[in-house]
């Protein structure tokens, strides 16, 4: 889905949190302690000052914004006849772009650079990768349950980690390998549980074939999404450093440049007949769908704000661990709101996926500590291309 910000969070987890955007947050400055005269009642500004520097509040806000984004995306694309994903993603990008511009006008975002056509041309290939990522993600979420979708998203971390080894001189530690094994295991268990639930639910009949075909389509889209997401995040990391973009610069260009692409794709590929529009937006749910589409665009801003807030008042390590822990409530939200099958296999897959995220987050913490010289370390193994690049630059 436009899990644009969710995907950015995945990348930040791989890198150790907020390494590829530059600034932590353009409009979240560190507040000085609020002082009030003795004997007076606390003012509203004092209360909000405390809240703004509360680690617990920032963590809760980040988790709620991320969960709500996934739930709303799933709700919108779960219609029986839904087939307007390009249109939906275009609305998301439009809402997000308008929200960023309004935030700049009101002073909430203080350092968003003016639009530069030369930068836009250089950034456009990244935006095309973003379109492929969000479109394949939307289709995968349409066919798969939220828990399965969340579990399979972990596979993106593996691809990105090895992409970093090849192109950025990264390394993979034994603890990371353990987490990767757990991620693969959780995905296999989730797929097996999903298929068994489909067979048990409808029996061996034509309905079984239809249910399995739906799951197979979901897995195919999920596989494409893993490739597209990894390509987008690795490509963005490479380009963003050359262009010296801040967090909200990249978000602004991403959303602005994807709007024409998504609109053209929607007009060319999707059915805009009145009959199909009526199927996609039934009268009984039309208003809810429109609200959900608008909220999903705003949610990208909310997640970005809460991510930076969490990093500012806690640490990148805490943020990374919270991102891993947040996989569990996201998966559980799918069980609660969308009647996903609750079986021994599905619960096991969620548990293993949750543990794999924790192990990976801990592995990144240890790796950063080693790089900082806080732990004993050995020379990491890297690819020949990365080693040659390092030798050439030394």
UniProtKB/Swiss-Prot annotation:
It comes from Chaetomium globosum (strain ATCC 6205 / CBS 148.51 / DSM 1962 / NBRC 6347 / NRRL 1970) (Soil fungus). Its main location: Golgi. Involved in the import of GDP-mannose from the cytoplasm into the Golgi lumen. Keywords: Cytoplasmic vesicle, Endoplasmic reticulum, Golgi apparatus, Membrane, Sugar transport, Transmembrane, Transmembrane helix, Transport. It is found in: Golgi apparatus membrane; Cytoplasmic vesicle membrane; Endoplasmic reticulum membrane. PANTHER family: SOLUTE CARRIER FAMILY 35. Belongs to the TPT transporter family. SLC35D subfamily. NCBIfam families: nst (TIGR00803). Homooligomer. Residues 78-81, 146-150, 200-207, 271-288, 339-341 are lumenal. It is a multi-pass membrane protein. InterPro entries: TPT_transporter. This is GDP-mannose transporter. GO terms for cellular component: cytoplasmic vesicle membrane; endoplasmic reticulum membrane; Golgi membrane. Residues 1-56, 103-122, 169-174, 229-249, 310-317, 363-394 are cytoplasmic. The chain crosses the membrane at residues 57-77, 82-102, 123-145, 151-168, 175-199, 208-228, 250-270, 289-309, 318-338, 342-362.
